[in-house]
């Protein structure tokens, strides 16, 4: 039913225009603005496949389907967003000590109730990763930590802003090093 694809070599605005012209009666949305040359699309499989071809015609270097279990960050995820909203309505989320940068808004938030709304919104909304990193840089963030195996986010951060020092935390020794660095 749903699919996602990575479009390399086109910016978010261009890919958004392509998705708007290709979807016909099906959903296809720009789902992730990862870095200046990487955008992920999400929606109905046929619409995503059509958008891949249109993106290649528009000059994309590569456009490939991603092995995902669902079309995340698009309107097809509304039932999941509704379920999340119901679950979050039953809890109290305290205001954070450190501001949260919500990737759906690319801005900081300090109100727990608003953060609950943003968590729901991100299920169907575009991930504004590039803008979030740019915002954090403008706020003076000079150090980021990617926690977990892999280097995908670290690579994106480097392509967005080479001035930010990227640290990877993936095992016991790297956790210790991060803790020492943060003290």
Over which residues does each language-model region extend?
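Acyltransferase/transacylase module recognition
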Residues: 89-183
């Amino acid at each position: 039913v749903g699919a996602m694809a990575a479009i390399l070599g086109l910016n978010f605005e261009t890919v958004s225009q392509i998705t708007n012209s290709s979807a016909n009666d099906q959903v296809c949305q720009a789902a992730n603005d990862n870095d200046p040359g990487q955008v992920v699309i999400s929606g109905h499989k046929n619409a995503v496949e059509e958008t891949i071809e249109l993106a290649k015609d528009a000059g994309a270097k590569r456009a490939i389907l991603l092995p995902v279990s669902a079309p995340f960050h698009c309107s097809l995820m509304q039932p999941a967003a509704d379920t999340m909203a119901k679950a979050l309505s039953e809890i109290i989320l305290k205001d954070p000590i450190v501001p949260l940068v919500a990737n759906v808004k690319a801005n900081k938030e300090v109100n727990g109730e608003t953060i609950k709304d943003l968590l729901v919104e991100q299920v169907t909304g575009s991930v504004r990763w590039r803008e979030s990193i740019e915002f954090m840089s403008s706020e003076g963030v000079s150090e980021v930590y990617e926690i977990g195996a892999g280097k995908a986010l670290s690579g994106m951060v480097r392509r967005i802003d080479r001035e930010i020092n990227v640290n990877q935390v993936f095992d016991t020794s790297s956790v210790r090093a991060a803790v020492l660095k943060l003290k």
